[in-house]
């Protein structure tokens, strides 16, 4: 007679647990969604000043007690100076495109991505105060903001290199960079509404998107890991 083999009662629960884990939402998709939102936020921080500066430098009308009142522009900047302010971001942005890849490799793409967007968001929140202090300080601030936000694309590549399987890498990369035009499309009209109807006028555009960037940064720190 052969000895009857008893079923392993622990096998079924283990298999069931493994199946449930496989059926869950893959963590790499969470990373991709956060990267999409991060790049959308980067473009929001980058382009909101394009709309806000028109309200900063042009006279505007408001209605008070049934009367239309014309308020003078807060800043008397020439068109050339406005162009310098708008372009100053890119002076810093281009500097970190290649070194950003090394920083991502050296310190980890997830850490550098999160830290850089956090600092860029803080700088956006400070923009109204710095602009009212000195135009030179504003130009320096925008250059530094470009430096920090310039590392995001190299970090995006590094993060997907670790998280995305080869069969999905191209598709997941396309999803993340789609955040760039989406961020621009949302930011442009919303900045116009904020500069007109916001509680602090043009400054509201910087407070709004800077705050969004900080919220994104805290969520990133909580749920995203290096690998």
Regions found by a protein language model. Name each.
Residues 95-109, 195:
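Helix-to-loop junctions at the C-terminal end of transmembrane segments
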Residues 168-199, 204, 210-213:
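Glycine-rich segments within core transmembrane alpha-helices of 12-TM secondary carriers
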Residues 129-141:
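Helix-loop junctions at membrane interfaces in 12-TM secondary transporters
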Residues 2-58, 62-76:
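Cytosolic juxtamembrane N-terminal segment immediately preceding the first transmembrane helix
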């Amino acid at each position: 007679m052969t000895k009857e083999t008893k079923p392993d009662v622990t096998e079924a629960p283990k298999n069931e647990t493994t199946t449930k884990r496989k059926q869950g939402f893959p963590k790499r998709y969470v990373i991709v969604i956060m990267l999409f939102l991060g790049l959308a936020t980067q473009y929001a921080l980058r382009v909101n000043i394009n709309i806000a500066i028109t309200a900063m430098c042009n006279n505007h009308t408001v209605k008070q007690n049934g009367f239309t009142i014309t308020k003078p522009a807060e800043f008397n900047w020439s068109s050339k100076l406005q162009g310098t302010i708008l372009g100053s971001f890119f002076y810093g942005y281009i500097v970190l495109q290649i070194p950003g890849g090394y920083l991502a490799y050296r310190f980890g793409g997830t850490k550098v991505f999160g830290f850089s967007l956090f600092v860029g968001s803080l700088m956006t929140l400070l923009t109204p105060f710095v602009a009212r202090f000195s135009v030179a300080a504003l130009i320096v601030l925008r250059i530094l903001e470009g430096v920090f936000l310039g590392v995001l694309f190299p970090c995006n590549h590094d993060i997907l290199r670790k998280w995305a399987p080869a069969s999905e890498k191209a598709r997941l990369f396309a999803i993340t960079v789609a955040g760039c035009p989406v961020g621009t499309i949302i930011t442009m009209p919303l900045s116009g509404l904020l500069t007109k109807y916001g509680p602090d006028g043009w400054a509201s555009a910087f407070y709004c998107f800077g705050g969004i960037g900080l919220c994104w940064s805290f969520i990133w720190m909580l749920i995203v890991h290096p690998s």
